[in-house]
Regions:
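Basic amphipathic alpha-helical segments that dock to polyanions
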Residues: 10, 29, 40-50
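Short hydrophobic beta-strand motif reused across regulatory alpha/beta modules
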Residues: 53-54
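The short coil/loop that forms the "turn" connecting the two helices of the helix-turn-helix
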Residues: 34-35, 58, 90
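C-terminal regulatory/oligomerization modules of transcriptional regulators
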Residues: 97-120
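N-terminal positioning helix adjacent to the helix-turn-helix/winged-helix DNA-binding module
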Residues: 6-9, 25, 66, 77, ...
Length: 120
């Protein structure tokens, strides 16, 4: 199933927050991304309906297997692309911004070629 860039960003954010927080809530996601809680709630509803997240009765958000798979793929792309750009002399700020855009549009074939080229 195709998933849009916004959904990928939410899933990646949930993954990152789950590594540092005991539980992830919509307010944590809103704070991390600088969005209104109401916007995050709508996105969480869509992710839940597409079986990418589970929301407990207490409002705790966790990734399903499919959500985690997507989040980890996007996170891997982000890390590899940003590090690759910085290794070529791109400033950290620019590399992180560019990686955030590129991670969503690069084909798997091109991403694998970059990984092979840089020896990862």
């Amino acid at each position: 199933m195709a998933i849009n860039e916004s959904a990928e960003n939410y899933l990646e954010t949930i993954l990152m927050l789950s590594k540092t927080l005991p539980v992830v809530r919509a307010v944590d996601i809103a704070n991390e991304l600088g969005f209104k809680k109401s916007s995050v709630s709508i996105a969480m509803k869509n992710l839940r309906e597409n079986n990418h997240i589970i929301v407990s009765g207490a409002g705790y958000i966790s990734l399903t297997d499919s959500g985690k798979e997507i989040a980890e793929m996007i996170f891997e792309r982000h890390e590899l692309i940003s590090n690759w750009l910085m290794s070529m002399g791109v400033s950290e700020e620019t590399a992180l911004e560019d990686a955030c855009k590129m991670e969503h549009v690069i084909s798997q074939e091109s991403f694998e070629a970059i990984k092979k080229f840089i020896g990862k």
